[in-house]
């Protein structure tokens, strides 16, 4: 079986960066360059996702839709309350009212799966958890390839057992949320290429891989390790078409103030790699595993930081290759990364 991301002229996938970063314009530019585009379905209702998918259909016949698969983590209410209390002075300083009663949601997952079954697309990928065999079967029945994001060999084995068609292997150096099915585990640093080799030794499925990509050489390393395509997110954050906020863009280009990244649960309650700023330094130690409750708790603060242009309170998602992100058209960036590996 040939997976959709194996058919594009260039073996580059534009990462589905939820929350407005992966815009329709960014996806279109990735497709125009010969890469594989995604519609980022995270944080959207089915009604909001629908027009983005239909717009993508007008741009490219080959594309994917990414969803957040529910992965409930038992909430430690006392730890949550301690974190909320620690945030109160900062919230008061910025005139923000915190959502101190824990909010739970499934990101409209069932409704989005229902919509994708009724309006089939070439490929659907899942992150944050593995799809159930039932969901795999429903999407297969309408001709959709199902891809699971995995971060360990164990997750890869389980995904294969559930019948997925391919894997996206996310290394620990990737920016933004880890797609791990176990967000409570400690995520150890390692090259993504090593993880790809380990998984391919155990699982016979096509693989796309990403995490820590800082240029064309890194793309080549992942392809040499056995990946069919390479997922790029951080290197597209400064693209003209990306929805990256102004303070996020400024921080990415300020190597003196924002020189390192780290995995933190402080913004959302789920491990995510970000540029280390004041918020991370102050609250990482008291943060807890409680997604989406912490996401909702800090949402108002992050919105205020974005509106006021303050990068020190903002979730500055970035992988370890962030220093090599440059402004320009996404089409040019994708071609620079993938042209030498054209199929």
At which residue positions do the language-model features occur?
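Conserved active-site-proximal phosphate/metal-binding subdomains
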Residues: 174-208, 213-343
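Active-site entrance/lid segments in N-terminal catalytic domains of soluble metabolic enzymes
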Residues: 1-202
